[in-house]
Amino acid sequence: MLELRSCSNLVNSSRRLVPLVTYSGLSAITLPKSRFYSQPSALEVQGTSDSRSDNILDELKQRGLVSQVSQPESFLRTKLNGNDKIKLYCGVDPTAQSLHLGNLVPLMVLLHFYVKGHDIVTVIGGATGKVGDPSGRKTERDVMENDIRQSNVASISQQLQRFFKNGLEYYRNRCALTEDVPSGKYTPRNNFNWWKDIKMLDFLADFGRHIRVQSMLARDSISSRLQTKNGLGFNEFTYQVLQAYDFYHLYKEENVTIQVGGNDQWGNITAGIDLINRIQPIKNKGLPFGITVPLLTTATGEKFGKSAGNAVFIDPSINTAYDVYQFFYNTLDADVPKFLKIFTFLNSSEIKKIVETHIKSPSLRYGQTLLAKEVTDMLYGVGSGSDSEALSNIIFGRYDGTLSAAKLVDLCKKARILQYADREIDLIKLICKLVNCSVSEARRKLSQGSVYLHHSKSKVNENISNLAPFLIDDRVLILRIGKQKCFIIEMR
């Protein structure tokens, strides 16, 4: 199952303004190489398919979305080349309130299949979440209260449905497709719905004989924990059995033949394949397969999806479209080509042109801007990227005066950054209110020329008792203090 991260300590840190920093040009960077992703030079962006008819497995590999495929891979390729419709799934345990950006990589695999006519299933671990997956962990998880788990299940269900709905809309818009072009079918599932009726003795009698303890002990997630001081609880030891049965159940009841997960899920996925092959006659259904995605890291070696030590979440109640836009806008130059391949449906020729344009003037952040707009559109709906770009331009001093006050208020409310003030307030008091400083400190900021009003390039050096001339449509004031603080205020 996908690992989620705690949503605590996020809101304040993720919304702060991130100052622009200067990165070296792409032409001077040697991008990281691995067997998952290879980039000999910034200009050699190759491999993403320009055709919907090309083998989807090859395209996913070329985009850096595939790490391992269970054997025989040739059989899977034959099915895909024959235009057979397949059904695949990915599981998520409700260990946090929201999915984070790092969870998107396996979900992008499902999305690629989905938009090209294949059926997909997501399984939320309402049952397995009670047990806890030891994969990739050195210690056992803390026990979660049942009501919190149920709340997480409900939240994640909405996030998954929103992701595939918006993702399909984004794909159709990006590829200029009409709605009559068929996609696959999306089916959400909760494994509690089948586990609640299974009795332990019946399960052991029917399935225990097909599960080999020697294979369980040999898996990395188990063997590594057995070497630690605290060892491994029986609950976590049996987790792979539960996930294996999930795959078997979906294979038998819903004709699901592929499970997708992170690299740390390889042992759990192959456990399911082993169980299916031992129980279910292969002649009745297609072979079961597993596909894993690589752990995505940045050019600096950090886990992708982190911002100042906190994960960036896709739940709009936690992180807004503007938050996600800013996260991708601050992508390192070296990561732009890779992230364009993984998180967008841009084809190879489009990505190559973007990179070439970016190299000419890296300081303009052309590549980051397009990346941020594409991902924001995919996650929050088409148009969210352009809105976030417009808001970013205002906040970072690039406002051209074309947006109405009503549009500004709407954008800022969605980003949850709109401030309010009495229209009779003078500038000194307004500065004190916004930055929580003394009157003398506010006067000092004015005298130093650190204060700007509206989108004027001229500095304000003295107190202003009447701010009406600086309002947009007699309603909104833009106040900048220094290089990193910008406030958009609705005057009432």
Swiss-Prot record:
Signal peptide: none annotated. The keyword Nucleotide-binding applies. L-tyrosine binds at residues 89, 133, 239, 243, 246, 265. It is found in: Mitochondrion matrix. GO terms for molecular function: ATP binding; RNA binding; tyrosine-tRNA ligase activity. Disulfide bonds: none annotated. Keywords: Aminoacyl-tRNA synthetase, ATP-binding, Ligase, Mitochondrion, Nucleotide-binding, Protein biosynthesis, Transit peptide. One of its GO terms (cellular component) is mitochondrial matrix. It catalyses: tRNA(Tyr) + L-tyrosine + ATP = L-tyrosyl-tRNA(Tyr) + AMP + diphosphate + H(+). It is an enzyme of class 6 (ligase). ATP binds at residues 93, 306. A motif ('HIGH' region) lies at residues 94-103. Belongs to the class-I aminoacyl-tRNA synthetase family. Homodimer. Present with 996 molecules/cell in log phase SD medium. Catalyzes the attachment of tyrosine to tRNA(Tyr) in a two-step reaction: tyrosine is first activated by ATP to form Tyr-AMP and then transferred to the acceptor end of tRNA(Tyr). This is Tyrosine--tRNA ligase, mitochondrial. The lineage of its organism: Eukaryota, Fungi, Dikarya, Ascomycota, Saccharomycotina. The gene is MSY1.
